[in-house]
A protein has these predicted regions:
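Structural motif corresponding to the intra-repeat A-B loop/turn of tetratricopeptide repeats
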Residues: 5, 38, 71, 122-125, ...
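TPR-repeat structural position
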Residues: 8, 41, 74, 125-128
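TPR alpha-solenoid repeat register
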Residues: 27-28, 60-61, 94, 111, ...
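Flexible helix-coil transition and linker loops at the boundaries of alpha-helical arrays
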Residues: 16-17, 21, 87-105
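"A position-specific structural signal for the A-helix of alpha-solenoid helical repeats
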Residues: 30, 63, 107-110, 114, ...
Length: 172
């Protein structure tokens, strides 16, 4: 109940944040979601890992990969993305909330977008083109995928700034 009302601290105060082998899937999921929403990705990941070990699926793999990128566990993120891309079905969707109006996109597009973000995170200067290519693959599946469009624009802007710096350095 607390979780559905956005009362994440109250939810955690009720059930705690400790990892307990006897916790039900629902308790583990409440802990994972509450910690994620409280911007505690490392702690949330511990609980997501428990859920994933009990029953791995594409949706958990996506969430875990996203948080692993945030916490700089790029190898772990790649493993989760690879698993999810191998097991994703065409009818799977992912909801995004970064705009005023939440929207859905294909889970495959979401995974390709996340793979692009991972590629960029692995080497922020050398991998811009490869990251843009992967995000473009996501946009081929769903041209209205707002987060992918915004991220591509940011990468293209960064690429242009890099080119300007390199041109200025050559002049000197």
């Amino acid at each position: 109940l607390y979780l559905s009302e956005g009362k994440y601290m109250q939810a955690l105060n009720t059930i705690g944040v400790e990892k307990n082998a006897t916790d039900t899937d629902m308790n583990v999921e409440v802990k994972a979601l509450a910690l994620k929403n409280l911007n505690q990705p490392k702690m949330a990941l511990e609980h997501y890992e428990i859920l994933y070990s009990r029953s791995s699926n594409v949706y958990l793999a996506y969430e875990m990969a996203d948080m692993k990128i945030q916490t700089n566990d790029l190898v772990g993120a790649k493993l989760n993305i690879d698993y999810a891309l191998t097991n994703v079905k065409d009818d799977m969707k992912r909801t995004f909330y970064e705009t005023q109006q939440p929207y859905e996109t294909s889970m495959k597009a979401a995974l390709l977008y996340l793979k692009g973000i991972l590629t960029f995170s692995e080497n922020k200067s050398d991998n811009i083109d490869a990251a843009i290519k992967q995000i473009n693959e996501a946009l081929t599946i769903d041209p209205n995928f707002n987060l992918a469009k915004v991220s591509r624009q940011a990468l293209e802007s960064q690429k242009a700034q890099q080119a300007q710096k390199e041109a200025a350095a050559k002049k000197n």
